[in-house]
Every structure is written in structure tokens, then in C-alpha cells.
A protein has these predicted regions:
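Accessory recognition modules or surfaces
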Residues: 281-286, 308, 333-353, 376-377
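Short beta-strand
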Residues: 35-37, 324-329, 361-362
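Conserved core segment of the aminotransferase class I/II
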Residues: 236-308, 391
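Conserved glycine-rich beta-strand-loop-beta hairpin in the small C-terminal domain of fold type I
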Residues: 288-295, 307-319, 325-337, 367
Length: 396
């Protein structure tokens, strides 16, 4: 028999994955071209050709004992150094390989970070709406999320005042996801500065260390003049969890890292802890081929303009029909107000028109729904009549 801890997780499967599986069933009946699947954040822009070429060359030329052998749990030194130098060139920092630990994607990065700082009963602050897998990660270590309510009137910016009110001596971290999944909001420098100043005051008041865990898989996916602040510039005790899944369209390859800035408290021991957690959690090390490829390709990006066009067209199309949407500044999600209180029921209405979406309640954001527009542009265009038929029932 499976454990009591796992049973509710097994049978309460992710709404995102559930809708994705529903989409496959509909596609088998109506044809995939007649199903408009906006459920899963699965990049559909191909990885850059240069990355593919790097992988092929590595397979042909690299010493097979190095390519397929064990390595440091923190990863290859040359990959860690290449990432540090890329960050230095972008943010004017002075990181080295010693500040970087390679991981099997952002989920792994989050887990080894939490394993390193959390004790049973500790609290971690999250800003709703948020990626609900955080709850599962926290439960792995006996810790609990403390949820800050969403504020549509501010564009879903973090509520610093409520955050301060909910910080206790048990608070170990605050999770920031910027650009945000599911809203597409980008938290600007002034918001990060306010949040950082508040946390500095709370650290001093309580005599504790409170980390910012900055979950940044969408960092490179920003539009127009939007910029993602480098949080260590504002707050020393920042831990950056990064993934190449979105920036290089590599979600299946599971490659990312944790950055531990040298100004954070006890950073050297923290890096050792992350490396040890990689081993303890059975990850051991990030995939070898992907590490070596990333070392050659840190400056590459996938086609952000493609996502920007999809987001703009979807936003304009739905707002013209009467829907209220948050205009995305980053990531590849459109956050839309449900015309009825029951967002799950409304998503079922959309499904009847063969449009697959994710209810906002799956992100602790009831009354909204999320559309993931990492789809073909034809899917965006061809879905408009289906959206329109539903909109006419509510907006005339």
C-alpha cells in the first residue's frame, strides 16, 4: 500500500495535467487541429539549432568516460563557470563557479534549496496566485505555505504589507516567481526593492535569516520594456532557482541551477548543502550532456517574439469580446477573469467548445482561468470562434 502522505496527491492530480490528458482524448475524437489546448506550459518554439549542433558535437568528440561518468554533485566546473560569467556580463556581478550548483531543472533546484533550509513546521510565504507544486515541494520537508491573497487592482503585485503581517519566527523563506506563472506579471525593481527592505527589517527585528527563493524559469521571456530585476542586487539572502526549460525550450532535458550569491549568509556551506541534497534526494547530478551543451550556449535564447505575438493576439481577441484579462509582460500565460464565480465550471464550458484552459483555483486564484499560449499561432487564430460563442452567452 502507498503511504498516507502520497494517497491524496495521487488521487488529487494536478488540474493542469488533468486538462492536458483530457485534451488528448478530445484530439483523438475531433482531430488535434480542432482542439485548442491552452492547458500546459509546454514550450512549442524549437530549441536553437546551435544547441542541437553543440549536443551532436559533444557526442562525437567528448571523452566518453567524462561524458557518461560520475562528476561532482554540484556539476561540471566549466559549466558552472560559464553560467557565472554569463550572469556577470548581464548583471555586473562577480560570481564564480563556486556560486553555482547544477540541477535537474527548476523543480530540482527548488527541492534541494528547500531541503537545505527547512525544518518540519517551518513556514514559507507565497503570493497567490502561484504554481501549486510549491505546496508539494514544501510538504516533502514538513513545511507549510503561508499564502498572501491576490490583489487584482495592483496587477497582481506582491502585497508587502500583508507579507510583513504574516511573517513569524517560523518564517524561513519567501518565494518569488518573476515573471509570474500564472498571471504573466513582471515585478519591477520598485516592487522588489520594497519587498527586500521589508524583509531586511523583519530579519533584524526577529534575529533570524529569511531567504528569498527566486524561481526564475521565465526570466528571459519578457516583452517590450519589461525587465526582471536581479534580486541579489536588492537582498543578500537570495537564492535563485533557474531552468533552461523555457528560455531554450528544453523542458524534457531537465537542466537548471541554483545561484548562491557570495553576499548571502554562510554561502559556502550552503553550496555544500545543495550538492549534498542533490545526492540525498537521489538526483545525484544534473544530466551530463546537457551540462556540457549549456556551457557552450549560455547566451542563446529561444524565439521570445513568437510568444509575444501569441500573447498580444490572444489578449486583444479576448478583450474585444468582453473578457477582462491581465496584459502579460512576460512568461507565456494569459490570466483571464471568469465571467462566473465558479472558474472550474467556466473552464468546462470552454471545454465543450474544445478549448482547454486551467481554472484559477488550481493556482489559489479563484474566479480566473489561465491560458497557456505556447501554442501555434494557428491555434490562437482558430480558437477565436470558440471563445466568441462562449463570450456571447455572457457579454452579448
Amino acid at each position: 500500500m502507498i503511504s498516507n502522505l502520497m494517497r491524496p496527491r495521487v488521487h488529487g492530480s494536478s488540474a493542469i495535467r488533468r486538462m492536458f490528458e483530457e485534451g488528448k482524448k478530445l484530439a483523438s475524437v475531433y482531430g488535434p487541429e480542432n482542439v485548442y489546448d491552452f492547458s500546459l506550459g509546454n514550450p512549442n518554439v524549437p530549441a536553437p539549432d546551435e544547441l542541437r549542433d553543440a549536443m551532436i558535437d559533444i557526442l562525437k568528440t567528448e571523452d566518453p568516460l567524462k561524458l557518461h561518468g560520475y562528476m561532482s554533485n554540484a556539476g561540471f566546473d566549466e559549466t558552472r563557470q560559464a553560467i557565472a560569467e554569463d550572469l556577470n556580463s548581464r548583471f555586473g556581478t562577480s560570481y564564480s563557479a563556486a556560486n553555482v550548483v547544477m540541477t535537474a531543472g527548476a523543480a530540482s533546484a527548488m527541492n534541494i534549496t528547500m531541503r537545505s533550509i527547512l525544518e518540519p513546521g517551518d513556514e514559507v510565504i507565497v503570493f497567490a496566485p502561484y504554481f501549486l507544486e510549491y505546496n508539494n515541494y514544501l510538504s516533502n520537508y514538513g513545511s507549510v505555505p503561508v499564502v498572501i491573497a491576490p490583489h487584482p487592482e495592483s496587477g497582481f503585485m506582491p502585497d508587502v504589507q500583508e507579507m510583513c503581517a504574516k511573517i513569524t519566527p517560523k518564517t524561513k523563506a519567501v518565494i518569488i516567481n518573476n515573471p509570474n506563472n500564472p498571471t504573466g506579471a513582471v515585478y519591477p525593481a520598485e516592487v522588489i526593492s520594497q519587498l527586500a527592505d521589508a524583509l531586511k527589517s523583519k530579519q533584524e527585528e526577529l534575529g533570524t535569516v529569511i531567504y528569498i527563493i527566486s524561481d526564475e524559469p521565465y526570466r528571459e521571456l519578457v516583452y517590450g520594456d519589461a525587465k526582471v530585476p536581479h534580486i541579489p542586487d536588492f537582498y543578500n539572502n537570495t537564492l535563485i532557482c533557474y531552468s533552461y526549460s523555457k528560455s531554450l525550450s528544453l523542458p524534457g532535458e531537465r537542466i537548471g541551477y541554483v545561484l548562491v550569491p557570495p553576499q548571502s549568509d554562510g554561502w559556502e556551506e550552503f553550496v555544500l548543502s545543495l550538492s549534498t541534497a542533490n545526492r540525498m534526494l537521489g538526483i545525484v547530478n544534473a544530466p551530463s550532456l546537457q551540462q556540457l551543451a549549456i556551457a557552450r550556449c549560455t547566451g542563446l535564447r529561444s524565439n521570445v517574439a513568437f510568444y509575444e505575438r501569441n500573447g498580444a493576439d490572444l489578449y486583444e481577441g479576448l478583450t474585444a469580446m468582453g473578457f477582462s484579462c491581465v496584459k502579460p509582460d512576460g512568461a507565456f500565460y494569459l490570466w483571464v477573469k471568469s465571467p462566473i464565480d465558479d472558474d472550474a465550471a467556466f473552464c468546462d464550458e470552454l471545454k465543450d467548445e474544445r478549448v482547454l484552459s486551467t481554472p484559477g483555483s488550481a493556482f489559489m486564484g479563484p474566479g480566473y482561468f489561465r491560458l497557456s499560449y505556447c501554442v501555434s499561432h494557428e491555434t490562437v487564430v482558430n480558437s477565436m470562434p470558440s471563445f466568441r460563442r462562449v463570450a456571447e452567452r455572457y457579454f452579448g
